[in-house]
């Protein structure tokens, strides 16, 4: 399975791609039409991709809409939940 973790900020996002638990690639996209088109082309080459990103309020809404419009599976995590999961991994 292909999992893509997305760190969303105001103008851009960092995407980290893992396949079967192994790191594949990291890349940046702009949070605009061109960036989302690039991401869509990348995702179209994968089998059953799953996007995972933290709910960052207004910044994550664009990614959520992108996923819904393009019927891409995604998990939107609560920021507090993401922090606890990250802390648990580090200990």
Language-model-derived ranges and their functions:
Residues 1-91:
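Phosphate- and other anionic-substrate recognition elements at nucleic-acid/protein interfaces
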């Amino acid at each position: 399975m292909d999992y893509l973790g997305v760190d969303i900020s105001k103008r851009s996002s960092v995407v980290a791609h893992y396949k079967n638990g192994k790191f594949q690639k990291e890349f940046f996209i702009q949070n605009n039409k061109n960036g989302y088109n690039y991401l869509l082309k990348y995702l179209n080459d994968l089998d059953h991709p799953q996007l995972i990103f933290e709910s960052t309020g207004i910044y994550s809404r664009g990614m959520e809409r992108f996923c819904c419009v393009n019927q891409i599976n995604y998990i939107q995590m609560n920021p507090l939940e993401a922090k606890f999961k990250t802390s648990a991994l580090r200990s």
